[in-house]
UniProtKB/Swiss-Prot annotation:
It comes from Geobacillus kaustophilus (strain HTA426). The keyword Nucleotide-binding applies. InterPro entries: PEP_carboxykinase_ATP, PEP_carboxykinase_C, PEP_carboxykinase_N, PEPCK_ATP_CS. Binds 1 Mn(2+) ion per subunit. The lineage of its organism: Bacteria, Bacillati, Bacillota, Bacilli, Bacillales. Substrate binds at R56, Y192, K198, R319. Involved in the gluconeogenesis. Catalyzes the conversion of oxaloacetate (OAA) to phosphoenolpyruvate (PEP) through direct phosphoryl transfer between the nucleoside triphosphate and OAA. This is Phosphoenolpyruvate carboxykinase (ATP). Its EC number is 4.1.1.49. It is an enzyme of class 4 (lyase). The gene is pckA. It comes from the Bacteria. Pathway: Carbohydrate biosynthesis; gluconeogenesis.
Length: 528
């Protein structure tokens, strides 16, 4: 099936009388309830469940191997190739399936808040609640923008269409397939809404570097003087918590582009984790979950319809989707100048990385490529040994190009704009998990505040003997002895052993970057 035929078939589908275009939030909420797709919470949010897929399915994600992408994509476990023939057949089947539906829902909008670089997208949904989700998550067009809107990428999402691996060339019933030549994302077999969000992020991660823009998996905020800070970090390291600051306005919580004009949010909404959410801990997120927000896999009280955010029965990965405008303290539109500070967040359960350290450009590139954090492997089964995880550029699952391309762009931009970079450990202190304790949030906030406000620019530093990092000897609001990890351990020998163990894990992980400039590891990596 050629591209022209595909376009014709899609046009035919979208002209059907039962296809709803650009419904408002209120109309979509009505549809969700009429169609029995979800329930209304006491604040007017829509609560839905996603069946057996309560998170992304990275093993079911493919990119179509086409002449234009054959040489530019980093093929492998993250970016699995699929032939154009396999994709075309499956695309045809999904469209035939959607032709038979009673109702479909279409949203047109944008990815990218900077009008110069935004991507006009359209999303075709089988479910009304999915359409509500994309309405809240992507950038909503004005009436004038909608009239002139010509989609450059289409997401087709048919969760109840199940692939047959024997016939369809997939691994399972679920599939998330990106075709850059056909400018299409095809999703089926999974109801998890995050697939739509992250597939467009993957698309932007491929397209933006062609325009000299660095796409980033980070949160961003801006101070009263217009100073921009970026926060990189994997899940659970505190990106959302630390970038939500009453004294700074939020640009975005997850996906950004860095152009020669500055920073812009790729999205128009937030997709916040809400396990154990409380108004005391995260008032901005708690209060944003109002009318038209989407709650994914959150358990409700049957009578009062009040969400129980502490209930992880369905999944620990409970989520809330809401528009940025539901947060009071934001930059609107979500664009700002060049960053003056970058913070890499890691949750080190080995308890050996310093709570804050200043990075050189080479160290910044090294730690960006490493993308280190740790997770507590199987604590529920009594296994308490932490596991080191490395996710390149703090976003490996969403990077179609080789990691080095993103790291080199970051290195150039850090040098060009004289950006200060810090590594902040929000994990353990005084020993590894099980012995030490989690770093106090108040201390981490004080360190981040000092870093972002330039208070550490001229501070005296001590070099970490194992990781080579420059540790400030004093940070306002933080006891000095907390800053040096070895001082917090009772057993100094055990500290050294554990630190060397982690340093070796960094080295072993970095072997996969054998083809890059060796000075990055030489000047940026551990000393041992």
């Amino acid at each position: 099936m050629g591209i022209a035929n595909m376009t014709n078939k899609l046009d035919l589908l979208l002209q059907k009388p039962y296809v709803h275009h650009q419904l408002s939030v209120a109309e979509l909420v009505e549809k969700v309830l009429q169609r029995n797709e979800g329930r209304l919470t006491h604040t007017g949010a829509v609560a839905v469940t996603t069946g057996k897929y309560t998170g992304r399915s990275p093993k079911d994600k493919y990119i179509v191997e086409e002449p234009s992408t054959k040489q530019t994509i980093d093929w492998g476990a993250v970016n699995q190739p699929m032939s154009p023939e396999t994709f075309d057949k499956l695309y045809d089947k999904v469209l035939d399936y959607l032709m038979k539906k009673d109702e479909l829902f279409v949203f047109k909008g944008f990815a990218g808040a900077d009008p110069k670089y935004r991507l006009p997208i359209q999303v075709v949904n089988e479910f009304a609640w999915h359409n509500l989700f994309v309405h809240q998550l992507f950038i909503r067009p004005s009436a004038a923008e909608l009239a002139a809107h010509e989609p450059q990428f289409t997401v087709i999402c048919a969760p109840n269409f199940k692939a047959d691996p024997k016939v369809d060339g997939t691994r399972s019933e679920a599939f998330i397939i990106i075709s850059f030549e056909r400018r299409t994302v095809l999703i089926g077999g999974t109801e998890y809404a995050g697939e739509m969000k992250k597939s467009i992020f993957s698309v932007m991660n491929y397209l933006l570097p062609e325009q000299g823009i660095l796409p980033m998996h980070c949160s961003a905020n801006v101070g009263q003087e217009g100073d921009v800070a970026l926060f990189f970090g994997l899940s659970g390291t505190g990106k959302t918590t630390l970038s939500t600051d009453p004294n700074r306005r939020l640009i975005g919580d997850d996906e950004h582009g860095w152009s020669n004009r500055g920073i812009f949010n790729i999205e128009g909404g937030c997709y916040a984790k809400c396990i154990n959410l409380s108004r005391e801990k995260e008032p901005q997120i708690f209060d944003a979950i109002g009318f038209g927000a989407v709650l994914e896999n959150v358990v409700l009280d049957d009578a009062t319809r009040v969400p129980n955010y502490d209930d992880g029965t369905l999944t620990e990965n409970t989520r809330a989707a809401y528009p940025l405008q539901a947060i009071k303290n934001i930059v609107d539109p979500s664009v700002a100048g060049h960053p003056s500070t970058i913070v890499f967040l890691t949750a080190d359960a080995f308890g050996v990385l310093p709570p804050i350290s200043k990075l050189t450009r080479e160290q910044a590139m090294y730690h960006f490529l490493s993308g280190y954090t740790s997770k507590l492997a199987g604590t529920e089964r009594g296994v308490t040994e932490p596991e080191a995880t490395f996710s390149t550029c703090f976003g490996a699952p969403f990077l179609p190009r080789p990691a080095v391309e993103y790291a080199e762009m970051l290195g150039q931009k850090i040098a060009e704009h004289n950006v200060r970079v810090f590594l902040v450990n929000t994990g353990w202190t005084g020993g590894p998990y099980g012995v030490g304790s989690r770093m106090k949030l108040a201390y981490t906030r004080a360190m981040v505040q000092a870093a972002v406000e330039g208070e550490l620019d001229n501070v005296e530093t001590v070099q970490d003997p194992i990781f080579g990092l420059a540790i400030p000897s004093h940070v306002p609001g933080v006891p000095d002895d907390v800053l040096q990890p070895q001082n917090t351990w009772a057993d100094k020998q055990a500290y050294e052993q554990k630190a060397k163990e982690l340093a070796q894990k960094f080295r072993a992980n970095f072997r996969k970057f054998a083809h890059i400039d060796p000075t990055i590891e030489k000047l940026g990596g551990p000393l041992v």
